[in-house]
């Protein structure tokens, strides 16, 4: 599990390789990832946008920006949490993702929170120790 905290908002990520949706022969690898966003602060906030940077094992970067997550722009009061699962394909057996969410407070202040960088590893990925 990966974890980041920004302004009392915790984001945890748990990636999961899906062999049944992957094919070594076709160089298609697929992961799901479950994200939990927990508001430990004192004010209500809303997730407005997402910005992902996805990097495969060859260093190829892909940036994705969009409204909300999984079609929602959740509002989180103090102590509330939002959980969702999404997925990502890669042409390589490993890679990583990182990102940010734009939030807005009850008072209208916009700010960004970090999504922790997380590793996408399949059983086919060659391990390299530095």
Language model: regions and residue ranges:
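Detector for glycine-centered tight turns/loop "hinges" at secondary-structure junctions
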Residues: 8, 42, 59, 108-110
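Short acidic, flexible loop segments centered on an aromatic residue
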Residues: 43-62, 103
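Asparagine-centered strand-capping/turn motif at beta-strand->loop junctions
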Residues: 37-41
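Terminal connector regions
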Residues: 89-130
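Short, solvent-exposed loop/turn segments enriched in Ser/Thr/Gly
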Residues: 28-34, 97
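Low-complexity, acidic Ser/Thr/Pro/Gly-rich terminal tails and inter-domain linkers that flank the onset
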Residues: 1-27
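Short glycine/serine/proline-enriched coil/turn segments at secondary-structure junctions
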Residues: 23, 43-44, 91-95
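Intrinsically disordered, low-complexity Pro/Gly/Ser/Thr-rich segments with frequent PxxP/GP/PP motifs
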Residues: 62-94
């Amino acid at each position: 599990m990966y974890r980041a905290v920004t302004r009392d908002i915790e984001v945890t990520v748990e990636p999961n390789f899906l062999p049944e949706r992957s094919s070594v022969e076709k160089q298609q690898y697929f992961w799901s990832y479950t994200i939990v966003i927990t508001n430990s602060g004192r004010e209500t906030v809303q997730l407005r946008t997402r910005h992902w940077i996805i990097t495969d094992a060859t260093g190829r970067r892909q940036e994705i920006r969009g409204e909300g997550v999984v079609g929602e722009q959740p509002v989180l009061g103090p102590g509330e949490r939002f959980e969702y699962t999404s997925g990502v394909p890669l042409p390589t057996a490993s890679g990583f993702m990182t990102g940010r969410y734009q939030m807005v407070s009850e008072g209208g202040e916009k700010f960004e929170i970090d999504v922790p960088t997380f590793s996408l590893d399949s059983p086919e990925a060659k391990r390299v120790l530095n």
